[in-house]
Amino acid sequence: FYAVTDHAMFLGAVKAAADTTTEFSRLGHVQALHNLNAPENQNFDSIPDRVTAFSTFLPDTLAKVGDGSLDPDVVNQIAKDAWSDTIRAAETFNDPGNFTTFVAYEFTSSTDDRGNLHRNVIFQGADRLPAMPFSRFHSQNPEGLWDWMDGLRQNGIEALAIPHNSNGSNGQMFKLVDWASDPVDDAWARKRIRNEPLVEVTQVKGTSETHPLLSDADEWADFEIMPYRIATTLESEPKGSYAREALLDGLTLAEAGITNAYQFGLVGATDTHVGASSLEEENFFSKVGLLDADGERRGSVPMAPAEAEVIRAAGRVNVQEIAGREYATGAYETWSASGLTGVWAEENTREALYAALRRKEVFATSGPRIKIRLFAGNDYAKDDSLAERYAKGVPMGAELHGADGRAPILVASALRDPSSAALQRLQIIKGWVADGETNEQVYDVACSDGGQVDPETHRCPDNGARVDISDCSITENVGASNLEVIWQDPDHNPEHRAFYYARALENPTCRWSTWDAVKAGVEPRPDLKKTLQERAWSSPIWVMPQS
């Protein structure tokens, strides 16, 4: 399934500026866009002019709307026409049972200090839709988006919003205060979770599950960390920017008698701006076309002096000497070949997929098509069928009640992507509140190659999987095709409010930056990680306290 989520702010405006038959294209400040994609302009030397054309387009257009020299109705009509094109494309290619397409867009607000507040907005159907999408032009405040969505829902138009790139929000995505900096109340919490039942945890601009500074006991927390605010090299504050901490903060809201605003499911996305998914480490092509189309431009391979001069002139990224060689530096080298959303649904239709998104029976992966699943119940048996797992308990995304003091029984499973590395381990991540304090614990629950979890450390033994950095080959015949376990929390306390989600890890493989270096015949850049462990995350299950 697929959703095209174009930016709502100035939707269609660049295309209209490049089309010389439009009234908009005759404005002086858009002339540089006219032939931008002519073959002679699609080369390395064009980068400075391209960067200038795009970086000046937005402020110049806003200025002309502000001073009255550009009628805002012209911009609005362009957006309406582009929105109609988006709807038409989704309708044309929707093929129930085979390929599902959703009408969607991206709400692209941010704080004044560049903290990212972007949301992907997905519509359930296409029969009745607004004339144009709600954008930052309408409100910088995401609460305005929720009000707009509530209004649509009252008129029979159903949609949900998915916060994404929270890692670049500078602590703003998952605050415990509202836009006016007042403590959140129940009405605010209900409105948020009603409109935002999902959160994106991985994409091309890094992974937002958790951060080493927030989860120092999780050895796998330092995974594809993109440390910057979006479109800058300003550091982003981790606290308030990552999903696991938000899940924990949601428990504290519930403990205080407020609706859990952060009782969300986990999904992934690509967020590339090139109309395609760059998901394979070996074949990574990044996100912004000419600016990061090869290893030199995205900082994984040393730059030749002439190329370094062009990059310096563009001003988009820096050039830095590292270990005696010049590399492009900025944010590109921290980006990722990620991610995907998986949905457990009865059929491949808009109705079934959207219902699964709403009930949070969804999962995220960092690129590979790993399938992960989680159930929780009070009376599961080892040989239960899938139907019995649903009948006796709940799937991921749901709440579990009524354990009568017993630890819930969790059934977790993961199936490898046959085109990717084998699975190394299956984990359960638990979060809970005790005595007003939030806590988290990572449990290995299933190990590859016959390994047994150490009951003291809750860790699998090393399965011996290694990577040869010289050619990116990996250890053969190590790892599992599938892992499945029935597990009970050895530290369960029936009085604690808790969540559990599953995480599956592949054997180590080369990161895209190492692949770039191998193909170029150079040593990998020394300050970048050489390998990674691709992974999948289930949505959580929330276990309610007995009291």
List the predicted regions and their residue ranges:
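A metal-dependent hydrolase metal-coordination microenvironment
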Residues: 1-157, 161-177
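C-terminal functional module detector
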Residues: 1-17, 22, 72-75, 87-97, ...
